[in-house]
Amino acid sequence: MFQGADLPSGWHLNTCLVNFYGAKLEGGKRIDTARVGEHKDFEPGPVASLSLGERALFQFVTSSRPGERDEVVEQQWLDDGSLQIFGGDQWKKRTFHRVQRVDTKGGHTFDIHVAGFETRRINFTFRYVPDEHVVPFAKLSKQAQQDGRGYVEELAKHSKFFAAALKAAP
């Protein structure tokens, strides 16, 4: 779903966004939150997406005015182990994409300890962020460091990289 010309100079997959899909557990009830609304990824070049667990209905849609139904341009089920790669103007600039829903039929759950959450699907999205936009934790503004510190501290418990990033920060 992309051409060689869609690869910017210096392109390489240097970041990974990990999304957990499943249900919030509140008062003994499961509230399904396994979806992502329509959006565009603005990083240059193709995006590679690896899906694990329950299958998800992935759609490309046209933008519309609020209150109107979106037109589905392309859709596909992303099964356990699926690798999807997309890029180019058609899929990154002219259309939005979304995860419309995640099945429960396979009975997949992950033994991941996130308080109040049951994970049925994990998605790893790899993309290229130009080097000039990658900022070390120590060089973030004081406010940005404060906002992200708790998360980085949690990551540092199991990662030498994040432990070093915390140590280097003022």
Predicted regions and their residues:
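Core nucleotidyl-transferase/polymerase catalytic module
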Residues: 7
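Nucleic-acid-interacting cores, centered on viral/eukaryotic replication and modification enzymes
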Residues: 4, 25-26, 112
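Catalytic core of Fe(II)/2-oxoglutarate
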Residues: 61-170
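Catalytic core of non-heme Fe(II) oxygenases with the double-stranded beta-helix
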Residues: 12-95
